[in-house]
Design a protein with these regions (language model features):
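Single conserved hydrophobic/aromatic residue that forms the stacking wall/gate
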Residues: 1-11
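Conserved mixed alpha/beta core segments that line enzyme active sites in large multi-domain catalysts
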Residues: 20-124, 137-139, 171-175
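Residues that form generic nucleotide/phosphate-binding pockets
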Residues: 12-13, 27, 149
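Terminal amphipathic helices with adjacent charged low-complexity linkers/tails
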Residues: 122-167
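Short, solvent-exposed cationic patches
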Residues: 4-6, 97-98, 153-156
Length: 179
């Protein structure tokens, strides 16, 4: 499996190509998209296109990330690790495997939540706001014509014309070959 150092190098390399940190994380740890019945075709095209660049990392993990502009976390598509968050009225965001890790006065809690499989929790530090999963991903998948690229550049194996040649019959019997 991919270790922390390899994952960090992979993230860094993709950031150097001009992608945003949320986009890199979507590529590295995609949602379960192939058989998702209600996912938009543009989001499926994004995941299909990027699946040609690298294999998905399926965890199990809750992966925190930051680059100074964003701080966030995402849960792998299997969702086997718990990730819970609390947002306080005085501006703190706390994420951990369980609630109650940090003592917070009940009247200071603005909201509690749980990260779901394949979903991203993101704080835009420049705007000082939490960005919803749909908002993040919809803006990223509309950035380029992924559907067009998939249609014009990906050829399924079932569409490749080929002929199967029968292999010649072996002329030697088993005992002769063993000698």
């Amino acid at each position: 499996g991919i270790g922390r150092r390899q994952r960090q190098m992979c993230i860094r390399d993709r950031l150097m190509t001009g992608r945003s940190l949320p986009e890199v994380m979507m590529i590295l740890v995609p949602e379960a998209w192939e058989k998702h019945k209600t996912m938009s075709s543009s989001k499926k095209a994004f995941y299909q296109f990027n699946s040609c660049l690298m294999e998905p990392w399926d965890g199990p993990a809750s992966i925190p990330f930051t680059d100074g502009d964003y701080i966030g976390a995402l849960l792998d598509r299997n969702g086997l690790r718990p990730s819970r968050y609390s947002v306080t009225h005085d501006g703190y965001v706390i994420m951990s495997s369980e609630t109650g890790v940090v003592d917070i006065e009940p009247e200071n809690i603005k909201m509690h939540g749980r990260l779901e499989p394949g979903k991203m929790f993101l704080v835009n530090m420049n705007e000082g706001r939490i960005v919803e999963d749909d908002e993040i991903k919809n803006s990223i998948v509309k950035k380029y014509p992924y559907s067009k690229w998939v249609k014009s550049n990906i050829l399924p194996l079932s569409k490749i014309p080929y002929r199967v040649k029968k292999s010649p019959k072996e002329k030697l019997n088993f005992e002769t070959r063993l000698k």
